[in-house]
């Protein structure tokens, strides 16, 4: 059972809907959360834009399964984006692991949604899903007995770090939007307001991280299960690629993508792959100076598909590399003046460990500079935790 959404979560939803309206020209949007996690469908609106919009015009198709935990064999019913029976309407599930917590419904009257726009909506849905988990855990804490302190701190630190990446991507999209809006454009004040609220959210996340609030798991002491399923790599990585391209333009860097055609599917939890690659890309951008290059490359070999995130930054000293995946370790970067928590690589490695996978680091990568992180995923067998 889900707790009712807090006022803070509802306010975050409204801010994200305003961003979508202003940047993508949506005519109406809504965020629904499930009121129960059982076999009876029950959806409750949390935020609607514009506020006077009729919920009937943003109806959830009856074909959408009930809000519940989705077994691996049924995951095909919950694609990242669902085109409804209504014209120009998208429905994106707010998913955390295999749990459908709610849906984001977006409607636009005069033109269909482009692939890049759908990728931006997926970023918004991902942000709202993680924010919903944080909100639920906060409420769970106030109604539940204490859990072991170290366990709660570690799980909450991980979630805060995972939330920073999609919020940072939204911040980048807003900055790009402001660069393209004329000073007298009627939508500029709204975009500036969204930019300020996004910066405020990032500051709050950093403040919460430093305070290390004690927040337990959504379902108590038992973690939600991982489940492997066949993934289309190009489609799965599209939201991350779109965000990286926007960030490269904003920061004066080059982003290179190398994805060969006709890749075989791999069996891996979609959320796991996106979190791992998202953390690697975030690190690559942070430690690559202006004018540098960041790359994402997929290479098919036997018996594994190799995914590599590389950069032309300053590199990682050999003596620091054995400790890269320790929680909180930043090495020489701790004195660089670049913000960081030292959690990204540790989280990535922890997410991969149940599948028997791990990251491999190469530094220097190009000449005497740069760093590359490679993930080898067997594609001739199903990978299960």
Curated annotation (Swiss-Prot):
GO terms for molecular function: 3 iron, 4 sulfur cluster binding; metal ion binding; phosphorelay sensor kinase activity. PROSITE patterns: HIS_KIN (PS50109). [3Fe-4S] cluster binds at residue 13. The keyword Phosphoprotein applies. Residues 11-131 form the GAF domain. It catalyses: ATP + protein L-histidine = ADP + protein N-phospho-L-histidine. It is an enzyme of class 2 (transferase). Its EC number is 2.7.13.3. Autophosphorylates, possibly on His-161. InterPro entries: GAF (IPR003018), GAF-like_dom_sf (IPR029016), HATPase_C_sf (IPR036890), His_kinase_dom (IPR005467), HisK_dim/P_dom (IPR003661), HisK_dim/P_sf (IPR036097), Sig_transdc_His_kin-like_C (IPR004358). Its cofactor is [3Fe-4S] cluster. Belongs to the chloroplast sensor kinase protein family. Hexamers; upon treatment with 0.5 M NaCl only tetramers are seen. The tetramers are probably inactive. Oligomerization seems to be mediated by the histidine kinase domain (residues 142-386) which forms tetramers and hexamers. The DHp subdomain (dimerization and phosphotransfer, residues 142-270) forms hexamers and octamers. NaCl treatment reduces the histidine kinase domain to tetramers and the DHp domain to hexamers, suggests the DHp domain senses NaCl. This is Sensor histidine kinase Hik2. The gene is hik2.
């Amino acid at each position: 059972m889900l707790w009712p959404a807090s006022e803070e979560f509802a306010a975050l939803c409204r801010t994200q809907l305003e961003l979508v309206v202003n940047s993508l020209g949506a005519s109406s949007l809504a965020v629904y959360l499930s009121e129960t996690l059982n076999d009876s469908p029950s959806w409750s609106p949390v935020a609607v834009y514009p506020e006077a919009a009729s919920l009937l015009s943003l109806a959830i198709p009856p074909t959408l399964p009930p809000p519940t935990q989705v077994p691996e064999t049924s995951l095909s019913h919950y694609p990242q984006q669902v085109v409804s029976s209504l014209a120009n309407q998208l429905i994106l599930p707010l998913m955390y692991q295999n749990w459908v917590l709610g849906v984001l419904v977006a409607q636009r009257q005069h033109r269909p949604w482009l692939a890049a726009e759908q990728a931006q909506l997926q970023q918004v849905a991902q942000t709202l899903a993680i924010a919903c988990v944080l909100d639920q855990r906060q409420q769970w804490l106030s109604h539940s007995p204490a859990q072991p302190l170290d366990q709660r701190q570690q799980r909450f630190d991980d979630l805060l770090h995972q939330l920073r990446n999609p919020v940072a991507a939204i911040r980048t999209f807003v900055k790009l939007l402001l660069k393209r809006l004329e000073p007298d454009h009627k939508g500029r004040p709204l975009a500036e307001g969204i930019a300020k609220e996004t910066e405020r959210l990032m500051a709050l996340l950093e403040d919460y991280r430093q305070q290390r609030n004690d927040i337990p798991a959504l379902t108590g002491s038992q973690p939600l299960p991982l489940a492997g399923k066949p993934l289309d790599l190009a489609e799965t990585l599209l939201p991350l690629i779109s965000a990286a391209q926007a960030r490269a333009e904003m920061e004066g860097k080059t982003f290179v993508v190398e994805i060969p055609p006709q890749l075989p599917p791999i069996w891996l939890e979609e959320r796991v792959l996106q979190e791992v690659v998202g953390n690697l890309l975030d690190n690559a951008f942070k430690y690559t100076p202006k004018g540098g290059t960041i790359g994402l490359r997929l290479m098919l070999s036997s018996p594994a598909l190799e995914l590599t995130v590389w950069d032309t930054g300053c590199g990682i000293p050999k003596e620091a590399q054995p400790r890269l995946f320790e929680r909180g370790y930043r090495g020489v970067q701790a004195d660089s003046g670049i913000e960081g928590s030292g959690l990204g690589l540790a989280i990535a490695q922890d997410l991969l460990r149940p599948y028997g996978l791990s990251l491999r680091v190469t530094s220097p990568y190009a000449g005497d500079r740069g760093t590359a992180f490679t993930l080898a995923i067997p594609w001739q067998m199903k990978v299960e935790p």
